[in-house]
Design a protein with these regions (language model features):
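Aromatic-rich carbohydrate-recognition surfaces in CAZymes
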Residues: 196-296, 322, 477-495
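The feature captures the catalytic groove of carbohydrate-active enzymes
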Residues: 61, 67-69, 73, 182-184, ...
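C-terminal capping/lid segments that line or modulate ligand- or cofactor-binding pockets
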Residues: 206, 250-267, 374-394, 429-499
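Structural helix-adjacent loops and short alpha-helical linkers that scaffold large soluble proteins
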Residues: 102-109, 211-223, 267-286, 333-353, ...
Length: 499
């Protein structure tokens, strides 16, 4: 039975923290959340492991497993309900998925490898609702599993295309009861509780990350799944179940269409043929572009207030909503210039980009805060600078001190300067700011934040959603959005040969 889907995935355990930020912020769920927001977050899962039937289990907090390199398959298969032959077949499938991946070879090799392995495991899984108790002691891991060798990836090449669909999935083996089957390309936010949904934002970043490491087919699969769930008006719901349904009455978020187009634009920039994007995503991309043109066809040329990645209701427009709309329009322009038919000529799209950029500079500069004409800077400042777009006027100056304003004593970052002073760091925002810093030449900040993320993984090596004031991981682990951002940040460091 699915746990009660209380609102605010990334705010479930700290929703009350958002209340002091602005009188405009309203939390979903009302009195149901009174008192819950002030409970100290705890670690809900420590990582992932593939068990019998090829299903994916969350690891209990504190548990470790020695993995087959490049997979989330246990090196000792029997305690997890696998035979040696099943383990070998599933390992070939998992390694075939990542055979073409280009990952960094130096300082960040292990961090990037673990992020990719977890992201692929969370894409299209058959997911069990809770941890499995292995039939015997699990083989302890001595640290992060090494990246797969060239020999192991070469062996994976013999796996057929039909075997390379998903981490650990083998249709020849019966799955245990209770497994929730997600379709191919569906990126599950995290393996536990109210995170077992697909958020368009997370999926778009996952597609961009997979493209960045040379896994274009995986990236197209992620966007194809999103496209299958798109609303008729070209937008997206806040989140989806494994069947593509909406789990509650949470309103659709205006950023979804923008992130969908942005991710497609990243694939195009990474070398994906325009014909592939047209053939597989053409109509959904056109609907998304039409949606962005519609919501910016106003006197202000700005979208209406909407929930963004903070996932609280807003009556004042946030940078976290406005920026993805701009990024989506910019991507639509590039896609149209590459030959995709989006229902509007490239020139019209370019003119709307100019209008929206000018409107954002008029209304958010010079403070570039989270809210319109305010100084409450948050991680969305990264979205109005490289690597996302050309710098908007004055944003670079604000970005220079943004991380310091969001700093937590353990070394990570809060979602924004106005977040509750509870000492909790959030890994997706920290990873986003790391990527931003590295792209802007702020090398010390970027490497420091990446090193902090690397040092605050779980015992099994997974990236958690949060890190507490005492340095311990909290929330679910791994978190797909953080994994994607790690790949994007580390992929920006250097061009490397296939892993």
């Amino acid at each position: 039975m699915r746990p009660l889907a209380l609102p605010g995935r990334r705010r479930f355990l700290t929703l009350a923290a958002a209340v002091p930020l602005t009188a405009a912020a309203v939390l979903w769920g009302g009195s149901r959340l009174v008192g819950l927001g002030r409970r100290a977050p705890t670690l809900l899962s420590g990582g992932l492991v593939v068990g019998g039937g090829g299903v994916l289990y969350p690891l209990a907090p504190g548990d470790t497993v020695a993995y087959v390199p490049g997979t989330r398959l246990p090196r000792a298969p029997e305690p997890w309900g696998l035979t040696t032959s099943q383990q070998s077949a599933l390992a070939r499938q998992a390694l075939a998925r990542r055979q073409a991946a280009r990952l960094p070879q130096g300082r960040w090799a292990g961090l990037a490898d673990g992020a990719l392995t977890d992201l692929l495991a969370l894409t299209g899984p058959a997911l069990m609702p809770g941890p499995m108790n292995p039939a015997g002691p699990a083989e302890p891991s001595a640290g992060p599993t090494p990246a797969p060798t060239s020999a192991s990836t070469a062996d994976a090449a013999s796996a057929s295309a039909g075997d390379a669909g998903r981490e650990g999935r083998d249709s020849r083996e019966p799955q245990p009861p209770g497994a929730e089957v997600f379709p191919p390309g569906a990126v599950v936010a995290a393996p536990m509780s109210i995170w077992r949904y697909v958020w368009p934002r997370d999926a778009a970043f996952a597609a961009a990350a997979l493209s960045a490491v040379n896994l274009a087919d995986e990236a197209l699969g992620v966007l194809g799944n999103l496209a299958s769930w798109q609303r008729a008006d070209g937008g997206f719901e806040a989140r989806y179940t494994s069947s593509g349904r909406v789990p509650d009455n949470r309103p659709a978020q205006a950023d979804g269409a923008g992130w969908f187009l942005w991710a497609a634009g990243r694939l195009l920039a990474d070398g994906a043929p325009a014909a592939d994007l047209r053939d597989r995503l053409g109509a959904p991309l056109a609907r998304a572009a039409s949606r962005l043109l519609t919501i910016t066809d106003t006197p202000s040329h700005l979208p209406a207030a909407s929930p963004d990645y903070w996932e609280v209701a807003e009556t004042v427009l946030t940078l976290g909503t406005a920026a993805p709309v701009l990024l989506g329009l910019e991507a639509a322009t590039a896609l149209a210039r590459a030959g995709l038919e989006l229902g509007a000529p490239a020139q019209a799209l370019a003119e709307r980009v100019t209008a929206v950029r000018n409107a954002m500079e008029r209304n958010f500069a010079p403070a570039w805060g989270r809210h319109l004409r305010r100084d409450d800077v948050d991680a969305a400042i990264a979205l109005v600078l490289p690597p996302f777009t050309r710098p908007l006027a004055g944003a670079r100056t604000v970005r220079q001190t943004a991380a310091a304003r969001m700093h937590r004593p353990t070394g990570g970052l809060a979602p924004g300067a106005g977040w509750r002073d509870d000492g909790v760091s959030w890994t997706p925002e920290t990873a986003l700011m790391a990527w931003s810093a590295l792209s802007l030449g702020m090398e010390e900040e970027g490497t420091r934040l990446l090193a902090w993320l690397e040092a605050h993984r779980t015992a099994a090596g997974a990236l958690p959603e949060k890190v507490l004031a005492d340095g311990s991981p909290a929330g679910p682990a791994p978190l797909a959005w953080t994994c994607a951002l790690i790949l994007l940040a580390t992929a920006s460091r250097a061009e490397t040969p296939p892993s």
